[in-house]
Amino acid sequence: MIQVLLVTICLAAFPYQGSSIMLESGKVNDYEVVYPQRLAPLPEGAVQQKYEDTMQYEFKVNGETIVLHLEKNKGLFSKDYSETHYSPDGRKITTYPSVEDHCYYHGRIENYEDSTASISACNGLKGHFKIQGETYFIESLKLSDSEAHAVFKYENVEKEDETHKICGVTQNWKSYDPIKKPSWLNLTPKQQTWPQTSVNLQLIVDHSMYAKYNSNSEKITKTLQERVNIMKEIFKPLNLDITLSGIEMWDKKDLITVKTAATDTLKLFAKWRQTDLLKRIDNDNAQLQTAVDFDGETVGLAFKSTMCDKRYSAGIIQDHSAIPLLMAVTMAHELGHNLGMDHDDTSKCNCNVCIMAPRLNTNPSKTFSDCSNNDYQKFLTDKKPKCIHKKSLKTDTVSTSVSGNEPLDDNVDGFHA
């Protein structure tokens, strides 16, 4: 029987005092200190898992007590999830770690139908929750002998770069449409009729990003897994599941030339995926994660309507923010282009700030507009991408064997040179 933990988060005095604090998410000027405390122990004789399947937390936001329900995201990893790095002499070293007892959760706020939450419980609580249109972030203060956490809003995080972030989406070699630098969701009756689809996503970490995180492979892995956990929540209303097939780190050197010219880098990365990655790792789509600062305001680039195409089902992402939600939105935006979505036209779409807005907004959204919904359905109808129509969704059970070089669908119509 699934055991439920009940934890209360007791609010301390609001610590203004003109001071700020440096968190993993950046420098935060306005925050509340909270102390997660477990109220109900497990029943006698019960075996406690490292990370319970379900958890409940009670805490206050703006003086209002709310109850947060969390459920482990069991479909986060593919059955053959792998992690790859390289030896000094260039040999690939691939492992298949156990991922069943992971620490990533989705959730909702009790009695609030439109609420959502995406939380990592790997080392304290880290993530965000949304209630009544307001998004709050929570993060451990990592103080010695203390369970203190900070709760804050995005607007209270100092921004090093105030320029707008944009996206570049390409439909052919010569035409580029340049996101720019700045649930518990229930399906509607219409969405319930949409086919269940699933994208197996592979993430590649280039050498610049590896160096940016001080060569800490474990930290990079947790960071990317946290972002994909949020992506999975974002795509749920489309009846589309995101599974992480693996993470590869170019820890010794880059396997392509990662240029500041995003379009050149995207072409090189897509070619590498076709000629190298697909021969050894089964995936529907791959995204390159880099710390290289792309020219202009561009922080992401992807081919449009190319999901399942062996040549062009790819995107590139600049690691432009320490806030997981912003990075997950950027990754979801570029994947949206692969799935046939255009940038939102605010004069025609029913959403002022949605996932496919051409610029990242100061109030990050996890919602697709009606235009994006229509684009996606048109893509499914017109292109008929076979790879994402899987007979059964994969689970977190990990095999010990290599998936092999299974051929992908040839009957796709995407971006052609």
Swiss-Prot record:
Coiled coil: none annotated. The active site is at E334. Residues 197-392 form the Peptidase M12B domain. Residues 398-417 are annotated as: Disordered. It comes from the Eukaryota. Residues 21-189, 393-417 form a propeptide. One of its GO terms (cellular component) is plasma membrane. Binds 1 zinc ion per subunit. Residues 407-417 have a biased composition (Acidic residues). Expressed by the venom gland. Disulfide bonds join C308-C387, C349-C371, C351-C354. InterPro entries: MetalloPept_cat_dom_sf, Peptidase_M12B, Peptidase_M12B_N, Reprolysin_adamalysin. This protein is an alkaline zinc metalloprotease from snake venom that possesses weak hemorrhagic activity. Monomer. This is Snake venom metalloproteinase aculysin-1. It comes from Deinagkistrodon acutus.
